[in-house]
Each structure stands twice: as C-alpha cells, then as structure tokens.
Amino acid sequence: MSKSENLYSAARELIPGGVNSPVRAFTGVGGTPLFIEKADGAYLYDVDGKAYIDYVGSWGPMVLGHNHPAIRNAVIEAAARGLSFGAPTEMEVKMAELVTELVPTMDMVRMVNSGTEATMSAIRLARGFTGRDKIIKFEGCYHGHADCLLVKAGSGALTLGQPNSPGVPADFARHTLTCTYNDLASVRAAFEQYPQEIACIIVEPVAGNMNCIPPQPEFLPGLRALCDEFGALLIIDEVMTGFRVALAGAQDYYGVVPDLTCLGKIIGGGMPVGAFGGRRDVMDALAPTGPVYQAGTLSGNPIAMAAGFACLTEVAQPGIHETLDELTTRLAEGLLDAAQEADIPLVVNHVGGMFGIFFTDAESVNCYQDVMACDVERFKRFFHMMLDEGVYLAPSAFEAGFMSVAHSMDDINNTIDAARRVFAKL
C-alpha cells in the first residue's frame, strides 16, 4: 500500500469519511485521495514523493501559487506578535481600506472566517434590512453549508425549496426559492409569485460549483433590474471569482453593481478568511450599529489579516490578471485541440483564472441541466489518467479548475501534452 492509502485507512477510523471536507474523499472520481506533504509554486507533493502540476489551488485561494514568499513572511512576522487578541487591530483597518479600495461597490466590509460565514451573514443582513424572509438561489450554485442554502428545487418551477441534506428543517428550506442559472424568466416568475416576500437574490457571477459556467450577457444585468423592480437586494457571491476573474471581481468584469458582495478564498491568501460588504446604508444595519446580529471570536484575527493583506497587495500588481487569462486561455485552447485530434467531444469554459472541462457532444454548457448531461464516467477516467501523468485536477466533474500566476507556459504545455496522451487512450 502507498503511504496515502495507509493514511486514508487510518483517517477513516477517526474522521468521518477520512476527510474534513467531502469533495477531498475522491467520491466523485473513485479511488484513494492523495495526502499532501507540501506545496510550492504550481506544484503539490504527496506523501509518497510524487509531484503534480496543481489546478485545484486549495479550491481557489492560491492565485499567486503555493508558499508565496510575501504571504509566508507576513504570517511569520504576524505570528511573532501574537496569534489572536480578541480586540481590534491596525491590520483590520488596513485590510478594510484595501478591500474597499479594490472593490468599489463595497462601502463597508465585515471580516469573517469563511465563505460560508460570509454568505449566511449577508443573507441574514438582507433579510433584516428588507424585513422579508424568502431568498432566491440558483440550481447548481453553492454558497456554503448554511441551512438556508442546502436546498434543491421542488418538483415544479415555482415550488418552494426542499432540503438536500438531512438536518435541514423543511421550514427553513421553504423560504429558499431555486431558479435556473442563466434563465431570467424563472427569476421573474418567482418574483411575480412572491412580489413582497423576497429579500434577496444570491448568485455566483461565474458558477464554479457546477464546474465553470459563465453568465449569459443579459443574465447579471437582468438580475440587477429585477431586484430594483421588486425591492430586493442583489448579493454577488465572489468567494471564487473575487480578485481572480478581475481585480475588482466578476462584478467589474461583467459590469454589474451588487448591493452586497461576499468574499473568501483569495482574500485570505490561504488562511481561513471571508468577508461581506456593500452599500453603507445596508451595512449600517449590522450590529453593533444596527439590529442585525453577527459576530465571531476569530474574525479579523491578526494572522489571517496579515496573510490577506500581503496576498491582495501582490494580486493588485499590474499584469497579474492578464497573465492568468493568458495561461488559462492557452490551456483551454490546447485541451480542445488535443481532444479534437483524438475525436473526443469536449467543451472547455474559462473566465480569467477559472476553467471547466466537460465531456459532451453539446456545443456549449450554460446551466445545471447542461452539466448533468455531460459524460461523468469519462471524466472519472480522464481524472485518474491525468493524475498518473502528474496533473492534479479537481476530483469532481462538477468543480472548476484554477490557474495561478506561478504556473509557467511549460507547465501548461506539459499539461496539454499529458492530455493528448490520455485522450489517445480514453
């Protein structure tokens, strides 16, 4: 047995499923998950000593690559001054100044510890601000594991949501309406059925949890217009896309102004950090200035703030996003060419430093239904064959891939060459 196999066997006796987040268990592709010993730049190194070109990037945060010296040094220096104070620090102010400077739609920001905390807090704030209970989310979009968000669509287009996890009360789920991504008609229908009850829409501007689905040109502006028409707030969940699709996020890339924005992943530079913010009048409703309660013992802790500040300072440098786009475009085009040579039907979506690989005969993949029609079994074989080639992709047909500026063009070309060999045998 490999060392990863031995560790996984031991882990399953002590940790549910052997992992601390389900997708890491390789249940979407089968086999034994890799146990990682270290990471540097664009590479992961497992406990058995094998190196992999990494396109998971810790599920998005590692836009600068692993073990970036500026972030590492910032963490070391901050740790020398103390790990957590439970009191305000200067770095929290500096971090808030930087975030609101980089994302102009955020007049104010509140730091939290994860993307889930950011989205659940933003939704609570939207409900408190509007005095309404219902929310709209989209089928196939993931916004963390808060009860109100673990909801699937009912049997009809306008039915109330149903829990998709045991432990979520039906009374919670009924306040969540699930619409179809990239389908404005389904959103209007929900508003027309509940015109005075919907507090907010929450949306991934690029859906990264049904692989990578960009919005149609009219979709995000249409959501903004519907929120304005019916008096709801628009929450854009930029946990994946923030500082990755563009410096000011996908909202800037696509030209839409939200009322609230949720951030995570890159904002922490690899540390557990989330944030939400937006319009000043909405944020003023948050405790202690307003009645909507939100708190956290470790929110804004000095280690996380130092890492996040160092990361965002580097990400804001000229050329970062042009490099991400160039590398991702080259990878997408190369994979398509290699698949075509092997007569394998493939669609590759990409936006900025995000990409998605779909085995499908369809010309495009634009929504959850399109994703579910793809060949998942072929993806599973592709994943394991690429892993054997030393390329680490997301172990699920429903998760986006992530590029970093630490990837070199040689890394990209080597990945394409590996895919060409795999496609020939797939």
Curated annotation (Swiss-Prot):
The modification N6-(pyridoxal phosphate)lysine is found at K265. Its cofactor is pyridoxal 5'-phosphate. Its EC number is 5.4.3.8. Pathway: Porphyrin-containing compound metabolism; protoporphyrin-IX biosynthesis; 5-aminolevulinate from L-glutamyl-tRNA(Glu): step 2/2. The keyword Ubl conjugation does not apply. Keywords: Cytoplasm, Isomerase, Porphyrin biosynthesis, Pyridoxal phosphate. InterPro entries: 4pyrrol_synth_GluAld_NH2Trfase (IPR004639), Aminotrans_3 (IPR005814), Aminotrans_3_PPA_site (IPR049704), PyrdxlP-dep_Trfase (IPR015424), PyrdxlP-dep_Trfase_major (IPR015421), PyrdxlP-dep_Trfase_small (IPR015422). PROSITE patterns: AA_TRANSFER_CLASS_3. It catalyses: (S)-4-amino-5-oxopentanoate = 5-aminolevulinate. One of its GO terms (molecular function) is transaminase activity. One of its GO terms (cellular component) is cytoplasm. GO terms for biological process: protoporphyrinogen IX biosynthetic process. It is an enzyme of class 5 (isomerase). It is found in: Cytoplasm. Belongs to the class-III pyridoxal-phosphate-dependent aminotransferase family. HemL subfamily. Homodimer. This is Glutamate-1-semialdehyde 2,1-aminomutase. It comes from Citrobacter koseri (strain ATCC BAA-895 / CDC 4225-83 / SGSC4696).
